[in-house]
Amino acid sequence: MPKKTKLKNSNKMDMINGPIWNKLPRFALPVAATAILEQLFNASDIAVVGNFTGAAKTASVAAVGANSPVIGLLLNLFIGIALGTNVIIANAIGRDDRGTVQRAVHTSVLTALIGGFLVMIPGEIFAVQILSAMSIPEDVLPYAVLYLRIYLLGLPVILLYNFLSAVFRSVGDTKTPLIVLALSGCLNVLLNLFFVIVLKMTVNGVAIATVISNAISSIVLFIVLMKSDKYIKLSLRELRIDKRVLGQILEIGLPAGIQSAVFAISNIIIQAAINSLGTIVIAASSAAFNIEVIAYDVFNSFSQACTTFVGQNYGAGKLDRCKKTLLLSIAEDTIATAVTIGLVLFSGRFLLSIFTSDPQVIELGYTRLLLIFSAYTFSMLYEIMSGYLRGFGISLVPALLTTIGVCGTRVFWIYVVFPSSPTFKTIMYAYPISLSLTAVLIFIALLAYHPSRRFKGAVSAE
């Protein structure tokens, strides 16, 4: 009979006992708020250099923006790997395996730091070549290289924050990372203003501010874990990599990370097609993207909740609760997504006017919102179903199907369909088509695997 796991900290959540319906939003909404805050704080970098760097403001804004694809690829890859940490610890907590929890926590910390250094070193060496390959204008390149090199210096602590956040999420504590991010984000904004306005720096100022604020947030989470209960307590003496646990983390996390990286590449290809349509279209698409990502953060947070709840209950052998988690996640996420989309569409033109006063840009941006949101139900469904499968440790299948359904379809669409009808709407149709196809593929995989039945015998035998 599975043991009941007790968690001491009030921020933590008992996922394997009691009602599920009221705990899912308590887990998911802080995750959504954290992601939205990250978007806002990242935007502050551009806002500060765009307003306070004098003659260099145009090049500075372009330099920060030009680094987004590179930084996005790196972060998406390692955030995916951190998901493996979340699942492994959640499974171990569910089966009351304190030893595995401890090994996973300490392995994750070193994985983040070592991974950061392994990427940082070649990144520093080849920064010029990487950014030059992206056809960045000559007047922007020096600023872009400066920003990237400073950012890479802080990559180990930036990755550490994401891995430590995954540890907290695995026990249901999504509030602590949110509070720490909110405080460090405010510090980031203040440092941006200090370095750029007072010290007259440009992109180097906002890059240094980003590194410092991330370092502080990582240190705070590190200290909190050192003072935590025995389940996820961190000890400097115990810092070592457990090869078996690392293998399990990578088995789940690496496919998710590669999926996110390939996802980013497909979006770069779409962005290139958008860029070919001129300045107005680029401005409209960029403004709309900054709005629609908020809705994505909301429904994706329920996917993370589903993964963690399923992970713990699978570890505890409570497969009926796993299935119930899936159904409740879909139901509650549908409501949350519908409310978010409704609010965004109702105020869409006003929100777009924050970014631009050009009526043509606003209308094109609203067109993008309508087409993207028409398929967000499908996106929500495949994210939840993928999260459910990952909770059982099935990570490669949703990663492959998402790569085929989303990335493959979009690349095909841009290179085959778009040339015959090179309009903004043609590009945007790639989103509902790819998202709906992926939802169907993941649903078929869910029916084929049927984890709650497939693992029933294995759990009973343990």
Say what each PLM segment does:
Residues 32-87, 151-158, 247-312, 333-340, ...:
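Transmembrane helix-bundle signature of multi-pass secondary active exporters and lipid flippases
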Residues 61-121, 158-177, 284-348, 379-402, ...:
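Small-residue-rich hydrophobic transmembrane alpha-helices
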Residues 40-43, 52-58, 92-95, 170-171, ...:
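Helix-loop interface residues and adjacent transmembrane-helix termini in multi-pass membrane transporters
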